[in-house]
Amino acid sequence: MAAFLLRHVSRHCLRAHLNAQLCIRNAAPLGTTAKEEMERFWKKNTSSNRPLSPHLTIYKWSLPMALSVCHRGSGIALSGGVSLFGLSALLLPGNFESYLMFVKSLCLGPTLIYSAKFVLVFPLMYHSLNGIRHLLWDLGKGLAIPQVWLSGVAVVVLAVLSSGGLAAL
């Protein structure tokens, strides 16, 4: 029985290769191209004067929403900062000590140095603490709306306090 089935399939495949019409008869022509569909979409949207969806002006901003945007932004800033620091360490002449001595020779005030250190460390602390918050969410903890707000406030307060402490070192 298997031999008959194998022979039938082999003959069918051989006929398909020899007769190109078998392949073409199953092809269906496309009604429109992607470019035509895109043009039709934009024409319809511009004629109806609707904003793009989702449009940011229709949302009422809340703390969890702002913290989510800031978490993404701090991740991008940290990634860019580390990449820039690594590239500058490779490409700039001298070593880290020479640049540190240059900054010390500028005789900047302690308030300016503290502020600069705070600005540098705050994104790291915020992103780290908010990342722990997201890991807790992944475990299913703290997903009720009041808990989301409370954990958001806690992350901001802890980030400010820990950044202030680290900047004071």
Curated annotation (Swiss-Prot):
Pfam families: Sdh_cyt. Pathway: Carbohydrate metabolism; tricarboxylic acid cycle. GO terms for biological process: mitochondrial electron transport, succinate to ubiquinone; proton motive force-driven mitochondrial ATP synthesis; tricarboxylic acid cycle. The chain crosses the membrane at residues 63-92, 113-137, 145-166. GO terms for molecular function: electron transfer activity; heme binding; metal ion binding. Residues 30-62, 138-144 are mitochondrial matrix. Component of complex II composed of four subunits: the flavoprotein (FP) SDHA, iron-sulfur protein (IP) SDHB, and a cytochrome b560 composed of SDHC and SDHD. Belongs to the cytochrome b560 family. This is Succinate dehydrogenase cytochrome b560 subunit, mitochondrial. It comes from Mus musculus (Mouse). The lineage of its organism: Eukaryota, Metazoa, Chordata, Craniata, Vertebrata. The gene is Sdhc.
